[in-house]
């Protein structure tokens, strides 16, 4: 322990060098960040897919109502189409949030790499 302390004190007068473990720490930190980014993307796409699947079912119902030519069924299409539009808005919001979060992470990673900073920060969704 004393030898490493002496080496450390001597090393303070030199320019900072990367410890052999620093590369591993940076790689581990980047891997954790990558997992977080992929999890965020995956969860967002799953949420969007739920709305898209619901829209597929709603569109099928609208088509069936239209084909039936029964006035009550056709009049129900107004509500169904409004629901479809609401779902499309939700999907757009999810994709917009994903895009923004991904761009922030990418920019953060770029700045971190450029500055040589190995610290990471997380952003809330």
From Swiss-Prot:
Q: Name one GO biological process term.
A: rhythmic process
Looking up Pfam families in the UniProt record yields: Elf4 (PF07011)
**Keywords, sorted A to Z:** Biological rhythms, Nucleus
Q: Which GO terms describe its cellular component?
A: nucleus
Location, primary (coarse class):
nucleus
Q: Which domain of life is it from?
A: Eukaryota
**A single Gene Ontology molecular function, please?**
protein homodimerization activity
Detail the disulphide connectivity of this chain as listed in its UniProt entry: none
This protein's record includes keyword RNA-binding:
no
Instruction: From the Swiss-Prot or TrEMBL record, state where the protein is found.
Output: Nucleus
Q: Does the keyword Nucleus apply?
A: yes
Region of interest (Disordered), residue spans: 1-28
The residue ranges flagged as biased composition, category Polar residues, are 1-18
The protein's assembly and partners: Homodimer.
Question: Which family is this sequence assigned to?
Answer: Belongs to the EARLY FLOWERING 4 family.
Role this protein plays: Component of the central CCA1/LHY-TOC1 feedback loop in the circadian clock that promotes clock accuracy and is required for sustained rhythms in the absence of daily light/dark cycles.
Under what name is this protein listed? Protein ELF4-LIKE 1
Organism ancestry: Eukaryota, Viridiplantae, Streptophyta, Embryophyta, Tracheophyta
